[in-house]
Amino acid sequence: MELLRLAILFAVTALAEIVGCYLPWLVLKQGKSLLLLVPAAMSLGLFAWLLTLHPSAAGRTYAAYGGMYIAVALGWLRFVDGIALTRWDLSGAAIALVGMAVIVMQPSTT
């Protein structure tokens, strides 16, 4: 159950980061309203706070989080941008998630 909770926390953290970066991209690249910068800042603030909830040292958290970030970013590509994923996308995400699991499930040193 702990692994599932951690995976959900990683996924929500990644989503907060992606939203926080996507909204300014809309403002800068597509000329959307500057008001989108308000929820973007809130989302990035949420992202930073969520990082504090992760149970490992910061460096290990960032390393493991990277695997989930890749998977969530590809989900964003598919469901928000509407671009079909390739087998290479899916294979890369699977490899990244396995790497995340190796880091997260290592034996405790305490």
Curated annotation (Swiss-Prot):
Pfam family of the protein (one): UPF0060
Principal localisation: membrane
Superkingdom in the source lineage: Bacteria
Membrane topology annotation: Multi-pass membrane protein
Residue intervals passing through the bilayer: 8-28, 33-53, 65-85, 88-108
InterPro entries linked to this entry: UPF0060 (IPR003844)
Keywords associated with the record: Cell inner membrane, Cell membrane, Membrane, Plasmid, Transmembrane, Transmembrane helix
GO cellular component, as recorded: plasma membrane
Compartment(s) where it occurs, according to its Swiss-Prot or TrEMBL record: Cell inner membrane
Family recorded in the similarity comment: Belongs to the UPF0060 family.
HAMAP family: UPF0060 (MF_00010)
UniProt-recorded name of the protein: UPF0060 membrane protein Pnap_4944
